[in-house]
Amino acid sequence: MVNDLTPHFEDVQAHYDLSDDFFRLFLDPTQTYSCAHFEREDMTLEEAQIAKIDLALGKLGLQPGMTLLDIGCGWGATMRRAIAQYDVNVVGLTLSKNQAAHVQKSFDEMDTPRDRRVLLAGWEQFNEPVDRIVSIGAFEHFGHDRHADFFARAHKILPPDGVLLLHTITGLTRQQMVDHGLPLTLWLARFLKFIATEIFPGGQPPTIEMVEEQSAKTGFTLTRRQSLQPHYARTLDLWAEALQEHKSEAIAIQSEEVYERYMKYLTGCAKLFRVGYIDVNQFTLAK
């Protein structure tokens, strides 16, 4: 266990508080910034993002009146979908000021009797009991040294029949790359350093084994693991295409340097998923 459980506000805000207008140039209308799920070949990105959200929510066993905690809630699409489809109360946690403001505004505009809150806070600061937990694309930012604490906190605030749906990018150890026949190239080393320093400071994707072992130690039972690897390559391709189509606007909102950096990130990550250096998995963890 680590002693300093202060959320990584600066690391997260360095990326996610760049500019909502900039992200809107390449994200779908739901502003979902994670892997989509293309159930059908003819799906639009928006349809595939909603399908991914439905895939995650469908694994939780939600019932009307339950309270769902969304850790790393982004711009709120998962919570709004949960209210609409499952009639549940929601609490969202984000470390991004821009996201918190966006979610609060969208909540204020909703016509529903269900409770809905968004907090500018990390899981480290949240101790309220909830019925279910979903976390999509946030675990990668926690750091390996906080995995045990995260699972302990999730286990503590869930009821005896509670479920945690963890959707996270997963990586390979150097030895696993060798075992899979993946070349350890200079490009790979440089690109991973670029991602860690210029795109997601503090980001540390876990291995599949890390998630399975740490969650089990806390008392969770893994009931299902589902890989969406090819879906993330396609998602990133579509983001890169959209950003390229809006190049002039992107440069006007930010700069040419930021535009080029994001194009390098999106196209490079698509390659990593396509070749198999990284994966993305949904872990269904029952208490």
Curated annotation (Swiss-Prot):
It catalyses: a 1-acyl-2-(9Z)-enoyl-sn-glycero-3-phospholipid + S-adenosyl-L-methionine = a 1-acyl-2-(9-cyclopronane)-acyl-sn-glycero-3-phospholipid + S-adenosyl-L-homocysteine + H(+). One of its GO terms (cellular component) is peptidoglycan-based cell wall. One of its GO terms (molecular function) is methyltransferase activity. S-adenosyl-L-methionine binds at residues 33-34, 72-74, 94-99, 123-124, 136. The modification N-acetylvaline is found at residue 2. Its EC number is 2.1.1.79. GO terms for biological process: lipid biosynthetic process; methylation; mycolic acid biosynthetic process. InterPro entries: CFA/CMAS, CMAS, CMAS_actinobact, SAM-dependent_MTases_sf. Keywords: Acetylation, Lipid biosynthesis, Lipid metabolism, Methyltransferase, S-adenosyl-L-methionine, Transferase. The keyword Metal-binding does not apply. Disruption phenotype: Disruption of this gene suppresses a cyclopropane group at the distal position of alpha mycolic acid. Mutant produces fully cyclopropanated methoxymycolates, but the efficiency of cis-methoxymycolate cyclopropanation is reduced, leading to accumulation of unsaturated methoxymycolate derivatives. Cis/trans ratios in purified ketomycolates are unchanged. Cells lacking both cmaA2 and mmaA2 genes cannot cis cyclopropanate methoxymycolates or ketomycolates. Inhibited by S-adenosyl-N-decyl-aminoethyl (SADAE) and thiacetazone (TAC). Transmembrane segments: none annotated. SUPFAM superfamilies: S-adenosyl-L-methionine-dependent methyltransferases (SSF53335). The active site is at residue 269. Pathway: Lipid metabolism; mycolic acid biosynthesis. Pfam families: CMAS. NCBIfam families: mycolic_MTase (NF040660). Catalyzes the conversion of a double bond to a cis cyclopropane ring at the distal position of an alpha mycolic acid via the transfer of a methylene group from S-adenosyl-L-methionine. MmaA2 also catalyzes the biosynthesis of the cis-cyclopropanated methoxymycolates. Cyclopropanated mycolic acids are key factors participating in cell envelope permeability, host immunomodulation and persistence. Belongs to the CFA/CMAS family. This is Cyclopropane mycolic acid synthase MmaA2. The gene is mmaA2.
